[in-house]
């Protein structure tokens, strides 16, 4: 037998398989990092040089932008500085315009006056529930007036309910020359008694408390009133409306009786033309 040959490093390298040799070679070579590869690629890429005309144009555009004030929010985006754009309208201006539109739609010439607010409570099994009651008078200032009341847990909601109820129950009152009542009248509700009287021009509204709100909303400029028996605003308002509902105009009386308005005025000493003029002024 032949003697075993001693294994040396040279012999091991010769007998190694090709795959192992390739793996050892890869381990021996240093690997490049990702940053190094990017830097190498940028260095190899040639830079594009600007022409003299392009450089001058860019410089002039930059100087012009620095000289002009910066606009915040344009017509396209509708930013806050631009006060709302034409396309989207999301800025402050767009919101304000929409709010103003709603206000114009709600403002239909009706006068709203808050007469009284009081706190109310309801006793339930778990305790007391507190709320608010509102009394509101509304009118158009041209002979129509109404009142309503509303209850809610919050004051604004109570006022809103009272206003809606008042708008539904408006009545028309005949006015003389558009400024005062045609004749005196009395009204009563509960313990409250109210007296209303016609007045000459320049008298003003001689009324206090809830009654003044009624005549201001009605459009009366001259009237004298008196209230006795109660200071409850609800009773005073109801008594005032009772007196106003009894108001009649000479025109309506003449129609019921089949006569002319001039005949009802009793102007025996006046001419027919003057009587007709007075009748036209007094009629609705």
From Swiss-Prot:
Taxonomic source organism: Erythrobacter litoralis (strain HTCC2594)
One of the protein's GO biological processes: translation
Lineage, broadest ranks: Bacteria, Pseudomonadati, Pseudomonadota, Alphaproteobacteria, Sphingomonadales
SUPFAM superfamilies named in the record: dsRNA-binding domain-like, Ribosomal protein S5 domain 2-like
Domain S5 DRBM: 110-173
Gene symbol of the encoding locus: rpsE
An annotated Gene Ontology molecular function: rRNA binding
Region span, Disordered: 1-105, 246-284
Keyword rRNA-binding: yes
Compositional bias annotation for Basic and acidic residues: 1-10, 24-43, 68-105
Keywords of the record: Ribonucleoprotein, Ribosomal protein, RNA-binding, rRNA-binding
Coiled coil: none
Composition-biased stretches (Low complexity): 14-23, 44-67
NCBIfam families: rpsE_bact
Protein's recorded name: Small ribosomal subunit protein uS5
Gene Ontology CC: small ribosomal subunit
Domain notes: The N-terminal domain interacts with the head of the 30S subunit; the C-terminal domain interacts with the body and contacts protein S4. The interaction surface between S4 and S5 is involved in control of translational fidelity.
Subunit structure: Part of the 30S ribosomal subunit. Contacts proteins S4 and S8.
A matching Pfam family: Ribosomal_S5_C
Family: Belongs to the universal ribosomal protein uS5 family.
HAMAP family in UniProt: Ribosomal_uS5_B
Protein's job: With S4 and S12 plays an important role in translational accuracy. Located at the back of the 30S subunit body where it stabilizes the conformation of the head with respect to the body.
């Amino acid at each position: 037998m032949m003697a075993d040959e001693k294994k040396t490093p040279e012999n091991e390298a010769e007998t190694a398989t090709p795959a192992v040799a390739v793996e050892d070679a890869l381990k021996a070579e240093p690997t490049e990092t990702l940053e190094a590869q990017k830097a190498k690629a940028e260095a190899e890429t040639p830079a594009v040089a600007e022409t003299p005309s392009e450089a001058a144009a860019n410089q002039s555009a930059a100087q012009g932008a620095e000289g002009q004030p910066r606009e915040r929010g344009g017509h396209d985006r509708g930013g806050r500085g631009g006060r709302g754009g034409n396309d989207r309208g999301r800025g402050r201006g767009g919101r304000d315009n929409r709010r103003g539109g709603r206000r114009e739609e709600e403002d239909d010439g009706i006068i709203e006056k808050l007469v009284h607010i009081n706190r109310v409570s309801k006793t339930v099994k778990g305790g007391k529930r507190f709320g608010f009651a509102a009394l509101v008078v509304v009118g158009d200032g041209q002979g129509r007036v109404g009142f309503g009341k509303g209850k809610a847990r919050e004051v604004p909601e109570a006022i809103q309910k009272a206003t809606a109820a008042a708008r539904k129950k408006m009545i028309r009152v005949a006015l003389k020359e558009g400024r005062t009542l045609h004749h005196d009248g009395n009204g009563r509700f509960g313990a409250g008694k109210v007296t209303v009287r016609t007045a000459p021009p320049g008298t003003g509204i001689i009324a206090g408390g809830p009654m003044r709100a009624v005549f201001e909303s009605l459009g009366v400029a001259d009237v004298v009133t008196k209230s006795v028996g109660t200071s409850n605003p609800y009773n005073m308002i109801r008594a005032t409306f009772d007196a106003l509902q009894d108001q009649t105009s000479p025109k309506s009386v003449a129609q019921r009786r089949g006569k002319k308005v001039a005949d009802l005025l009793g102007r025996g000493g006046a001419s027919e033309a003057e009587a007709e003029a007075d009748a036209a002024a007094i009629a609705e």
